[in-house]
Amino acid sequence: MAARRKARKRALDLLYEADQKAVSGGAPASGDAVALLAERIATPHGEAPMREYTVEIVEGVAAHQARIDELLETYAQGWSLERMPAVDRAILRIGVWELLFNDDVPDAVAVDEAVALAAELSTDDSPTFVNGLLGQLLRLAPVLRDEEAAAGG
């Protein structure tokens, strides 16, 4: 468990950094995340080796980011992606990817881990927001998964 939690945290760091670079530079965040991941793997700068699950998360979020962001925009009542704290955006992207696109993670674990990251790293209101939004998507997950399967995603 601790290994996956560390992998999520590192993926969050990469997704957050890529998102911030995209905001300041105008480049698409998903491509930046994969490029940043490749850069960190190639030149680790004294960091521990990249965990396999970190790579899987970053690549998975990047591959499905358009759909993930569409779902977040649709179900985050009153919140646009741009209005969300950047850390929450990255946490939610990981959570949605784990819920809908990664069969290896139990749904409850995906939500719990996202809420734990929000509690540790974001605002006081973030855990409730993340829990509520992912909880709503969790209730819709069977239908959303069927839609993804039908669309070939």
UniProtKB/Swiss-Prot annotation:
| Record's keyword annotation contains Nucleotidyltransferase | no
According to its UniProt entry, one GO biological process term is: transcription antitermination
Q: Which UniProt keywords apply?
A: RNA-binding, Transcription, Transcription antitermination, Transcription regulation
GO MF, any single term: RNA binding
Pfam families, A to Z: NusB (PF01029)
Naming one, the record's GO cellular component terms include: cytosol
Q: Which superkingdom does the taxonomy of this entry point to? A: Bacteria
Matches recorded under HAMAP family: NusB
Stated role: Involved in transcription antitermination. Required for transcription of ribosomal RNA (rRNA) genes. Binds specifically to the boxA antiterminator sequence of the ribosomal RNA (rrn) operons.
Q: To which protein family does this belong?
A: Belongs to the NusB family.
This one is known as Transcription antitermination protein NusB
Gene, per the UniProt record = nusB
